[in-house]
């Protein structure tokens, strides 16, 4: 279907460029939500602005729905982007330049391009005069690259309270490592951050009996935590990973025993564990070696996996029909807002190729953007045609 269209004539490319031109570096919106709202209302969507947060600078979010019957398919994404960095861009990061068959700009693949492709798919179906059996919605946040406190989590709570929970959700994150059609994400590992502070008694290194060295106790804790693998992985998940990220004593003197020692670590864990179970384990190990240790744990998300569904099969079939690739079902990589959505409905993630995301000269081939539009349109037609 893309062969009959010039890139300049496609709603997906036009919207992608408009979104990139909105400098929505988290936590600033830069007008991106407004750009998307106008596009959706132009297609007949009912759009609800959902700002959440404290004070005047609240996080912009939106929920938009077209139709009221079932099945209800939701597309989820984010308009905020990471900072472009200090320089090195061939063209401006918010210029949305077209060059050598690619669209350049911060957010091109992560994930303004994915949002534009889905909206473009809906626009194509509506412009053809076809009707969709059911309803289509979008959950869009301006708070995914940041703390994610007042974004998707809050919108989902609002959706549940207003009878808007979908039957299935697609998140448009750039899931493909190399080629469009490589991977559908059907789950994610959980993530836990921990801070361990071991108190001691400061003193001169020549008189250790008058001091209590917290570094030795901290090393014993870290040695115990890393002594053996957490697990061997499962059918769908790679082995859980514990990585020590910082060790700090705040002491550059060579003749002083420090008064305290601090370490931070991260665990990416599979569905053999829960965040609370790992937190209890860390605290238990710490208190064996240092009864006075202070352990602070933040659980960013639990591991989850979407079981096979007809919608997942339809998405995979649509991808293969357009790209010729049978997508691999995968759970690797970092966390995403799918971890929140999985509490409400089955969710899968599929978007553009992510090789350049968060990098200087982030870009997406225009051919990939148009092909993703084809995939989303084919999926909508299979599910709701």
Curated annotation (Swiss-Prot):
The keyword Secreted does not apply. The keyword Zinc applies. Coiled coil: none annotated. GO terms for molecular function: acetylornithine deacetylase activity; cobalt ion binding; succinyl-diaminopimelate desuccinylase activity; zinc ion binding. Binds 2 Zn(2+) or Co(2+) ions per subunit. Zn(2+) 2 binds at residues 110, 145, 358. Its EC number is 3.5.1.18. It catalyses: N-succinyl-(2S,6S)-2,6-diaminopimelate + H2O = (2S,6S)-2,6-diaminopimelate + succinate. Its cofactor is Zn(2+); Co(2+). Keywords: Amino-acid biosynthesis, Cobalt, Diaminopimelate biosynthesis, Hydrolase, Lysine biosynthesis, Metal-binding, Zinc. Pathway: Amino-acid biosynthesis; L-lysine biosynthesis via DAP pathway; LL-2,6-diaminopimelate from (S)-tetrahydrodipicolinate (succinylase route): step 3/3. InterPro entries: ArgE/DapE_CS, Bact_exopeptidase_dim_dom, DapE_proteobac, Peptidase_M20, Peptidase_M20_dimer, Peptidase_M20A. Zn(2+) 1 binds at residues 78, 110, 173. It holds the Pfam family M20_dimer. GO terms for biological process: diaminopimelate biosynthetic process; L-arginine biosynthetic process; lysine biosynthetic process via diaminopimelate. The active site is at 80, 144 (proton acceptor). Catalyzes the hydrolysis of N-succinyl-L,L-diaminopimelic acid (SDAP), forming succinate and LL-2,6-diaminopimelate (DAP), an intermediate involved in the bacterial biosynthesis of lysine and meso-diaminopimelic acid, an essential component of bacterial cell walls. Belongs to the peptidase M20A family. DapE subfamily. Homodimer. This is Succinyl-diaminopimelate desuccinylase. It comes from Gluconacetobacter diazotrophicus (strain ATCC 49037 / DSM 5601 / CCUG 37298 / CIP 103539 / LMG 7603 / PAl5). The lineage of its organism: Bacteria, Pseudomonadati, Pseudomonadota, Alphaproteobacteria, Acetobacterales.
